[in-house]
Amino acid sequence: MLATVQGVFAQWMTQRHAGAVAFEEPILCHHNYVARESYDDVELIVTRKGAIRAARGDLGLIPGSMGTGSYVVRGLGNEASLNSASHGAGRRMSRTRAKRTFSTEDLAAQTAGVECRKDAGVIDEIPAAYKDINEVIDAQRDLVDVVARLQTLLCVKG
């Protein structure tokens, strides 16, 4: 599936931005899983729910919202956090509250310049429903180094 997405994305970028896209090292990180890991010679079963592995050298992706960009990070190996970092910005408000608070017009305004759905079915994903990704990244300076900040151009939400 990754290869298919890469191919479609490269074609889309080439058509719209007149430049070839090359993919280097893939970032393979997931955020809801269980793993066996050793800390101080003790084997543990670590559950990461909404968190990514950030062992020394691990590449990770910490997404913001539909309209705020994301970060590529490299883990620092902070054992006090069980080599973990947040998976994303995190919610500022519940999905239900976001649906009650915002309109499709708000969604369109907050995602201007981003190719994405802008209908009532995704209002709960509006950028204002999420914490500020820059503040979240700043709070994790002891967990990850920033490799790159990504600007959102396209957001696929089922």
Where are these regions (language model features)?
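Domain-length cofactor-binding catalytic modules of enzymes
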Residues: M1-G158
